[in-house]
A protein has these predicted regions:
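PLP-dependent enzyme catalytic core of the Aspartate aminotransferase-like
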Residues: 1-120, 124-133, 146, 156-168, ...
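Conserved beta-strand positions
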Residues: 227, 266, 393, 464-466
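Short, surface-exposed acidic
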Residues: 132-136, 400-403
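Conserved PLP-enzyme active-site core in the AAT-like
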Residues: 125, 129, 135-366
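Detector for Asparagine
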Residues: 14, 45, 56, 68, ...
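Active-site C-terminal subdomain of aminotransferase-like
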Residues: 3, 7, 111, 117, ...
Length: 486
């Protein structure tokens, strides 16, 4: 269960490995000692001073990490951030099982008699929805899925393009977890770097990708693009024919040799119903991978599991991604499969219903507050299959200076959100959720999803997501009250 060579070579960790039968076999070491063990019994562990960290892995449950000694307390916040980004906390259901076993000082059992059936339902549904040509991979969360993708791509590049620099091309203002994790991976691994991909406001994704790929060609580097379509938070869709042309474009190095073709990794959490990989025309000549956060539409917010698929050209890449999903023990749990098997069959209908509600609400806001700038897909794009249920709202502002205008707008953002929550407490929530079964979700990206984004790239606008089940008349009534008092 411990892939020694990959963890050293791909992840860049430096360590010595020693197998011990009992704690007394652990010798003094001038460094950090990590004890890794597997157990079927959850119990209190008494650690020797020689052990700095104790990782106990419980099959099908997760793992428990004990930090030993005051001298190691300063690592805890960093460990928690890794758990938040590169992996995931033990699921609530598994935590309950672990606590029960701990209280009883006993072994535990996780019974999932229909797990194979649930796995088949989930995989078949994903293939039908995405039109993918590879077997879907299902992870414990969207971020753990992205981590497996990134580490799988790094592993592939190290094996096939030895010594060449690896470039992850990522929008600087995209969803906080995506952005933060990509930069953390680059900071931890030699020869890996993140390149900013401007996609919003006055920038065009296709043009930005073209410029960056031309620059990377000169360096003879390995390009991996991570992008969201539609973009987040401004919900913009690039010209897909132009994007196809840019991705397929033949480029030369300074020595006039062919460059390494890019891999296009698409986060399509906003529109998981759009079959990007099913199109013979769109990405047929490009290595394309798509992934989705399961905490949104796939499960309706009932679990965090995410999934990943690829087109025919990515079969070798998908093997690497699967390898790293297993190394990190980040596969979906049995309960997550059960939830996805129940919710995925209705996903496309829920997406359609949520889009209809969102379009209705956006049209209402446009009519009653025309001075507000709304970012949402056009009806033409919706007819092409882009039907998100999220929009961004740039409210009108006042003031004689730029600072006064910005401060007024930021206060207005909060005034609107707080009014919605106060007037419709059973439906309106102040959080970043999307694709939930019911309700509306309001946030300011700059102070939520973009927590680790550079200040200049943050978006101080209102982001709103609408669900398929919502009291739209009440939402319109409250918004009218807000707009009348601006």
């Amino acid at each position: 269960f411990f892939d020694y060579e990959t963890i050293k070579q791909t992840y860049g960790y430096s360590f010595e490995l020693k197998k011990v039968e009992k704690l007394s076999d652990i010798s003094d070491f001038d460094g950090t000692t990590v004890l890794v063990s597997q157990s079927e019994k959850v119990e209190v562990n008494t650690l020797k001073l020689k052990i700095d960290f104790f990782i106990n892995i419980y099959k099908k449950l997760g793992s428990v990490l004990i930090v030993n000694g005051k001298q190691n307390e300063h690592y805890i916040s960093e460990i928690q951030h890794v758990r938040r980004r590169e992996t995931i906390a033990m699921t609530p259901a598994n935590c309950h099982t672990a606590l029960q076993a701990l209280i009883k000082n006993s072994t535990f059992t996780i019974s999932s008699p229909e797990i194979e059936l649930n796995k088949k339902i989930v995989r078949d549904e994903i293939i039908t929805i995405t039109g993918a040509q590879t077997m879907p991979l299902i992870g414990s969360s969207g971020l753990s899925m992205q981590y497996a993708i990134m580490m799988g791509l790094v592993d592939f590049a190290q094996e096939n393009y030895q010594g060449k620099p690896i470039k992850f091309i990522v929008p600087p203002n995209c969803y906080g977890g995506t952005n933060d994790q990509a930069r953390r991976v680059a900071a931890c691994i030699k020869n890996v770097e993140v390149i900013d991909l401007p996609v919003d406001r006055e920038n065009d994704m296709t043009h930005s990708i073209d410029v960056i790929l031309n620059e990377i060609a000169i360096q003879d580097a390995v390009p991996f693009i991570i992008a969201e379509i539609p973009t987040n938070p401004r919900v913009e869709v690039p010209d897909l024919k132009q994007l196809k042309t840019v991705l397929e474009k033949k480029r030369k190095t300074t020595l006039n040799s062919n460059t390494i073709n890019p891999v296009f990794v698409l986060d399509q959490t906003f529109c998981p119903n759009t079959p990007f990989l099913d199109s013979v025309e769109l990405f047929s000549k490009v290595k394309a991978i798509s992934y989705v956060s399961g905490s949104k539409f796939p499960s309706g917010g009932q679990c965090t599991a995410g999934y990943c698929v690829g087109n025919e050209k990515t079969s070798s890449l998908m093997l690497k991604i699967d390898k790293h999903l297993n190394i990190c023990d980040n596969q979906a749990t049995d309960l997550q499969y059960e939830i996805l098997a129940k919710q995925l069959p209705s996903m496309n209908q829920r997406i359609f219903d949520a889009y209809q509600n969102t379009r209705d609400f956006v049209d209402f806001i446009t009519k009653n507050l025309p001075s507000a700038k709304i970012n949402f897909v056009s009806k033409e794009l919706a007819n092409q299959g882009f039907t998100p249920s999220v929009f961004s709202l740039d409210l009108p502002t006042k003031g004689s200076t730029t600072k006064e205008k910005e401060n007024y707008k930021r206060a207005l953002n909060l005034k609107l959100i707080n009014l919605m929550i106060k007037k419709i407490p059973n439906e309106s929530k102040f959080c970043v959720s999307y694709g939930q079964l019911k309700g509306s979700y309001w946030t300011v990206p700059a102070t939520s999803t973009q927590g680790t984004t550079k200040e200049g790239d943050k978006d101080y606008i209102v982001r709103v997501s609408i669900s398929p089940k919502i009291n739209l008349a009440q939402h319109k009534k409250v918004f009218l009250e807000f707009s009348a008092n601006i």
